[in-house]
Amino acid sequence: MYKIQEAEMLANNIYRMVVEAPRVAQHCLPGQFVIVKADEEGERIPLTICDYDREAGTITIVFMPIGESTKKMKDLKAGDAFMDFVGPLGQPSEFCSEDIEELKKKRIVFVAGGVGTAPVYPQLKWLHEHGITADAIVGAKTKDLVILEKEMSAVSNLYITTDDGSYVRKGMGTDVLRDLVQNQGKQYDVCVAIGPMIMMKFVCLLTKELNIPTVVSMNPVSYTHLTLPTTSRV
């Protein structure tokens, strides 16, 4: 069993849990995921690793309760436990395999939409730990859906935008990216976009126009008899 140390609602319908999983914490890297199962009857659910603490032996996950199993998960509290917590799985971020000195020469920008902020954070944290501070643009529908602001601002140059203008500035993440490049003189060697498919589509249309190589992250779930996920970055 994998004990839950912390459980909280980060924002409206977005939840965060810190789980005791020493082996996973020891070996995971940004971009990887775990498969969790709350109980014997529950589905196996793939969730991106949002953070990890090797010394404490913990993994942080962030999720939105959409299906039946994740709706049950949100009711778990500190002291409860997952039956299964398998990982780390999937390919780490490409940054983890690059030469650090070469990576330090790159100008990197991340664009995150909604809960897509969760898989962006560990990549920013890893880069920061290796002496690289990237730019990060976080977009949300409204102020109440902005998550991990404190954590993100500690490891990146953070820009926040909301669809309704209720926090910082009104607009889309693409509006901020265009402004940074065309009006503030920023230049980027690579863009990483993680969020809703429609958001990533418009980021790619913009970065194509701006001639910025772009990586997007897609996490479709393939329901086989084992209910295993497939993850890919394009």
What are these regions, as identified by a protein language model?
Residues 20, 39, 65-68, 107, ...:
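Short, functionally important structural connectors and interaction interfaces within domains
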Residues 15-22, 56-61, 114-126, 144-146, ...:
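Charged, low-complexity, helix/coiled-coil-prone segments
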Residues 2, 224-230:
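Conserved small/polar residues in nucleotide/adenosyl-binding loops
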Residues 71-221:
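FNR/FR-type flavoprotein reductase catalytic core
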Residues 37, 179, 230-231:
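A very general structural signal that marks isolated residues within well-ordered alpha-helical segments
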Residues 2-80:
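Ferredoxin-reductase
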